[in-house]
Amino acid sequence: MEIRNVKGTKDYLPEEQVLRSKIKRACEDTFERYGCKPLETPTLNMYELMSYKYGGGDEILKEIYTLQDQGKRDLALRYDLTIPFAKVVAMNPNIRLPFKRYEIGKVFRDGPIKQGRFREFIQCDVDIVGVESVMAEAELMSMAFELFQTLNLEVTIQYNNRKLLNGILQAINIPTELTSDVILSLDKIEKIGIDGVRKDVLERGISEEMADTICNTVLSCLQLSIADFKEAFNNPLVADGVNELQQLQQYLIALGINENTIFNPFLARGLTMYTGTVYEIFLKDGSITSSIGSGGRYDNIIGAFRGDDMSYPTVGISFGLDVIYTALSQKETISSTADVFIIPLGTELQCLQIAQQLRSTTSLKIELELAGRKLKRALNYANKENIPYVLIIGEEEICTETVMLRNMKEGSEVKVPLSSLSNYL
């Protein structure tokens, strides 16, 4: 038998997982600072739920992992955390609104594999249900900037409004049944360019005349400000989209983050579920060209799940932990899981007690040499593990209630009283 991972999956060894855990903690801390509550949903779901018409459209349906249980029920692994969240709200009508939740968990997509993108990956999501105002979007965008500032990553956020985009297509007489196809093509304009968009819409069965109209419209829109779209397109959807975008922009200015955002009139986020604001997050340095976070407003999913066709205003944002890890691993030295490594020299029993005492009286992470290695080999291990401090404890140290403290970065040693050790670390 060949021992190997499934294509698109990866093992993360301890030195890698340290950084991934740091990212997860940063997400949790930031989310909770914004008043979000934790939630956990099943990885395994009914296929009917995950393939629901508001659940992402045909593109995402091709990437769903499906299976059957022993009762012949059609099941699916979740491809995001949004649909399971909407399910929870729909199943629990007594949840107090507004409800702000976060969830960090694995999702699965049988899609293309590229840098920072796998088929099993972790998403870190925040969603707010019960707020109609685009103030919710502004807060989520502000939260994103705070998170990436914590992680020392500089980002920009591109944003748009689906009402604006749908209204533009309506104004140039794109048939309703072709709107989704055109939006999927326009969403790729930064990757494939205007000629690529023309080719893509033609391949989707759109006439040459209509393709020319689409491309000419794109070119004319690129120089427009948000306010200009009302005059350029006499359409009520465009007007609604412009109003919401202008309100959002006012909040972004008030929060001091507008300069790090970019209005992109053809950003669509692909998925058919979005009803208003959409946004994507990109690294400023371009070291990873795909987005490292995204989201938007989806007001119709929960009502559709509940079957009452009521609007449940909902907006969310999602961060890809794996792609953030890829970005950080390119520039950050992997730190150790331990702050202090204790090496006993014939004093194993006493060192066991000292390690326990330090764990219970300080916040230090303590690792004890358990394998009985000689001093040189034990120091070499601590060096390779990037452990900053080593305590060397022999019989003399036990008798004098001291320890030999070695600073691994400086290579210096000093004998200090055990009782005041924390003052030296």
From Swiss-Prot:
Top class in the EC scheme: ligase
Superkingdom of the organism of origin: Bacteria
Molecular function (Gene Ontology), one example: ATP binding
Disulfide feature: none
A GO CC annotation given for this chain: cytoplasm
Protein's cellular compartments: Cytoplasm
Catalytic activity: tRNA(His) + L-histidine + ATP = L-histidyl-tRNA(His) + AMP + diphosphate + H(+)
Keywords of this entry: Aminoacyl-tRNA synthetase, ATP-binding, Cytoplasm, Ligase, Nucleotide-binding, Protein biosynthesis
The protein's Enzyme Commission number: 6.1.1.21
Assembly and interaction partners: Homodimer.
UniProt protein name: Histidine--tRNA ligase 1
Taxonomic lineage of the native organism: Bacteria, Bacillati, Bacillota, Bacilli, Bacillales
Protein's gene: hisS-1
